[in-house]
Amino acid sequence: MKKYTIFLLAFALLLALAACGAAPESPGSAEGEYSFTDDLGRTVTLDRPERVAALIGSYADVWCLAGGRDTLAAAANDAWTSFDLGLDDSVANLGAIKEPSLETLLSAEPDFVLASCNTAANLELMDVLESAGIPTAYFDVQGFEDYLNMLDICTALTGERENYQTYGLDVQSEIESAVARADGSAPTVLVIRATGVSCKVKGSEDNVLGEMLAALGCVNIADSDSSLLEDLSLEAIIKAEPDYIFAVLQGSDPTDAMATLEQTLLTNPGWGELQAVREGRFYTLEHELYNLKPNARWGEAYEKLADILYPQK
């Protein structure tokens, strides 16, 4: 099956290259080539791009923040469903993140592709894109510093360096101000991610909200009880008695996720016995800020958590 898939990809590539063979080459940047190392350790060299494809919506958002909106030629479907980018019909929709359309991607004639290290479908396209001579950068954006690094590279490519200050360094200052509000009390927290089909407890790593809470001086109860990550146990939660409980409702429409959360936890009589619930310290949080990478809104996300954890008097 894998050989058949590779054959189809190669065949599609040959067709696309044949169709584009007579097209004039894009002129190079007056400033010359720009080189950087991506998060896979690959050296990427290119002129200022004129047609950019983003294989996940978050990276389309970063490219637009970097001043590249007018050069965005293609993006994954979540650029429309999860990010309010206001893209017009000139931007090709590549389809789902996990199943991008190679035909649509090549038809968009990108001269630069933004891809994710953590998405198998993106990694599978590497050889095809390299064979086509299309510069491709792979990024691994987990936390704010990773976002800042990507924004730095993207603003260098667009030439809009002032956007690095506005959407990067200024946001960093907002985060630092929020983190400085931590008073050393080290509140214990429970983090839950609810979808339309499941509820899972998350630790301090590999998720946006968990990492933010750790930076704000919180102690995640799942970090010391890894069994919670595998099996959501109300008994274990009651035993730990967290000071705060945060639930992220995944999806642009939280209705199904909220129904799952209610069915799994909220309707259980034991849930109402938790002190955090009784005293109003159970919060449902926005998907856009605490599940997706918030990008330019990272500072806002930190500030909202600081307002809950360390309210200013």
Where are these predicted regions, by residue range?
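Extracytoplasmic ligand-binding site segments that recognize negatively charged/polar headgroups
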Residues: 121-124, 139-153, 186-208
